[in-house]
């Protein structure tokens, strides 16, 4: 519990009561606090780290106060330089009627990445779900991570 207290405010899950009095039980050692977690539905499994972990994240869809509703999208991770937020790239085709052809286009999206998803790398494919606005630019939450396959055939810079 001491390793998660790195912020100025005391980090705790708001739905868990931590001041239980254990006078007559004769407790031995340090007991683990109960943990609040839930299923977001829509066929997405709750990660094991969300159930067993000790992180505190109020914007996590599995342990926080965020509901997933609206669109379900997918994209490729391009940047991981923010704290608990990643940038994903969504590629799509746009039809040009004059030339009867398609052109490639893309959009970048800022997405909240919960600490329950470890080992996320640039190039992984993520499935995101829409939620309420979490910040100025973040409106989606990561629900599932699919590891990038071995990219031997694609061109790599280095």
From Swiss-Prot:
CDD domains tied to this protein: Ribosomal_uS17 (cd00364)
Subcellular location, principal: cytoplasm
Domain of life: Eukaryota
Pfam families linked: Ribosomal_S17 (PF00366), Ribosomal_S17_N (PF16205)
Membrane-crossing segments per the record: none
PROSITE patterns to which the protein is assigned, alphabetical: RIBOSOMAL_S17
Keywords for the protein's UniProt record, in alphabetical order: Cytoplasm, Ribonucleoprotein, Ribosomal protein, RNA-binding, rRNA-binding
A biological-process GO annotation: translation
Entry GO terms, CC: cytosolic small ribosomal subunit
GO molecular function: rRNA binding; structural constituent of ribosome
Protein location: Cytoplasm
PANTHER family xrefs: 40S RIBOSOMAL PROTEIN S11 FAMILY MEMBER (PTHR10744), 40S RIBOSOMAL PROTEIN S11-RELATED (PTHR10744:SF9)
Function: Component of the small ribosomal subunit. The ribosome is a large ribonucleoprotein complex responsible for the synthesis of proteins in the cell.
Similarity-based family: Belongs to the universal ribosomal protein uS17 family.
Subunit structure comment from the entry: Component of the small ribosomal subunit.
The name this protein goes by in its record: Small ribosomal subunit protein uS17
Gene: rps11
């Amino acid at each position: 519990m001491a390793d998660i207290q790195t912020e100025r405010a005391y980090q705790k899950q708001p739905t868990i009561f931590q001041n239980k009095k254990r006078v007559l039980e004769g407790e031995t050692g340090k007991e683990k606090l109960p943990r609040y977690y839930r299923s977001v539905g829509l066929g997405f499994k709750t990660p094991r780290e969300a159930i067993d972990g000790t992180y505190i994240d109020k914007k996590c869809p599995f342990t926080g106060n965020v509901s997933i509703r609206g669109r379900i999208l997918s994209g490729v991770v391009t940047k991981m330089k923010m704290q608990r937020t990643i940038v994903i790239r969504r590629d799509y085709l746009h039809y040009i009627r004059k030339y009867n052809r398609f052109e490639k286009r893309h959009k970048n999206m800022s997405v909240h990445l919960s600490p329950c998803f470890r080992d996320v790398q640039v190039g992984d494919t993520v499935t995101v779900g829409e939620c309420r606005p979490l910040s100025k630019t973040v409106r989606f939450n990561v629900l599932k991570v699919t590891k990038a396959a071995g990219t031997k055939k694609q061109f790599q810079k280095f």
